[in-house]
């Protein structure tokens, strides 16, 4: 169904069955397949391809050459009806590629709200990206990667499959990330190594001094105490009782399976 207020350029191909929402704009030479849904106010500028079972929310901006919901590159894929889901107010710049999920990986590639994907960024099958993340130019995520809120991935960086990146992490340009990255950490390198807390980013997001102090102390426990994670976990749990921001560490470690960067 195409809403009466939607605008579709004569050169665009919108297959019968596609859902185009109120005030959405489908620009020149775009292709929207029959199982796709484009939400209210979303703009596809030109030469955008939306394939498969793909749901794109409201007020997104998708620039020329972007490919959304394409068949993934997992050799086990056998044409299963997997999906791509994108939330609201995302900016997806030129030549970004976002692939559909796999049956082995939960069936869906999922992107939240208010994210920015810069030129040539790649999101592979089954990635789970939360809200307000930034992938800079040519940043690439392998399959099953998880990015929590407010993650920044520097240009030309690559993240190994199944890696979890915690909230408010900043990865410097050219980083190769093969293990999980705890919340609030700054890291860079090949392979990526931690080099402190993302203090400036946290200040910009309104974290107060006591909270920053607690996060720094937890970072020191993890990386500078000379003890194992199991040994310092009781102290982290104690901090979490008085500083809710520290609970992000506990949630992260409960999900982590690849070990953390060192």
UniProtKB/Swiss-Prot annotation:
Catalysed reaction equations from the record: a (3R)-hydroxyacyl-[ACP] + UDP-N-acetyl-alpha-D-glucosamine = a UDP-3-O-[(3R)-3-hydroxyacyl]-N-acetyl-alpha-D-glucosamine + holo-[ACP]
One annotated GO molecular function: acyl-[acyl-carrier-protein]-UDP-N-acetylglucosamine O-acyltransferase activity
Pathway where it operates: Glycolipid biosynthesis; lipid IV(A) biosynthesis; lipid IV(A) from (3R)-3-hydroxytetradecanoyl-[acyl-carrier-protein] and UDP-N-acetyl-alpha-D-glucosamine: step 1/6
Gene3D superfamilies per record: Hexapeptide repeat proteins, Udp N-acetylglucosamine O-acyltransferase, C-terminal domain
Keyword Transmembrane helix appears in the UniProt entry: no
Record's keyword terms, sorted: Acyltransferase, Cytoplasm, Lipid A biosynthesis, Lipid biosynthesis, Lipid metabolism, Repeat, Transferase
Compartments in which it is found: Cytoplasm
GO biological process, one term: lipid A biosynthetic process
Family label: Belongs to the transferase hexapeptide repeat family. LpxA subfamily.
Assembly notes: Homotrimer.
Role played: Involved in the biosynthesis of lipid A, a phosphorylated glycolipid that anchors the lipopolysaccharide to the outer membrane of the cell.
Protein name (Swiss-Prot/TrEMBL): Acyl-[acyl-carrier-protein]--UDP-N-acetylglucosamine O-acyltransferase
The organism's taxonomic lineage, starting at the top: Bacteria, Pseudomonadati, Pseudomonadota, Gammaproteobacteria, Pasteurellales
């Amino acid at each position: 169904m195409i809403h009466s207020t939607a605008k579709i350029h004569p050169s665009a191909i919108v297959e019968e069955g596609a859902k185009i929402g109120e005030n959405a704009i489908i620009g020149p030479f775009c292709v929207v397949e029959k199982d796709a849904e484009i939400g209210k106010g979303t703009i596809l500028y030109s030469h955008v391809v939306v394939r498969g079972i793909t749901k794109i929310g409201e007020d997104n901006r998708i620039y020329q050459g972007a490919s959304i919901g394409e068949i993934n590159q997992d050799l086990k894929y056998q044409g299963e009806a997997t999906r791509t889901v994108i939330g609201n107010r995302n900016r997806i710049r030129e030549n970004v590629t976002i692939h559909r999920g796999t049956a082995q990986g939960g069936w869906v590639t999922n992107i939240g709200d208010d994210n920015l994907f810069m030129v040539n960024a790649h999101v592979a099958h089954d990635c789970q990206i939360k809200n307000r993340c930034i992938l800079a130019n040519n940043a690439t995520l392998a399959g099953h990667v998880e990015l929590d809120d407010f993650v920044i991935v520097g240009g030309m960086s690559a993240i190994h499959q199944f890696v979890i990146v915690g909230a408010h992490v900043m990865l410097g340009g050219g980083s190769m990330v093969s293990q999980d990255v705890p919340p609030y950490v700054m890291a860079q390198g090949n392979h990526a190594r931690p080099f402190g807390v993302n203090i400036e980013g946290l200040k910009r997001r309104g974290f107060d001094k006591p909270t920053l102090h607690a996060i720094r102390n937890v970072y020191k426990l993890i990386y500078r105490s000379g003890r194992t994670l199991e040994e310092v976990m009781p102290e982290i749990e104690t901090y979490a009782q008085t500083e809710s921001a520290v609970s992000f560490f506990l949630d992260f470690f409960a999900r982590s399976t690849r070990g953390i960067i060192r």
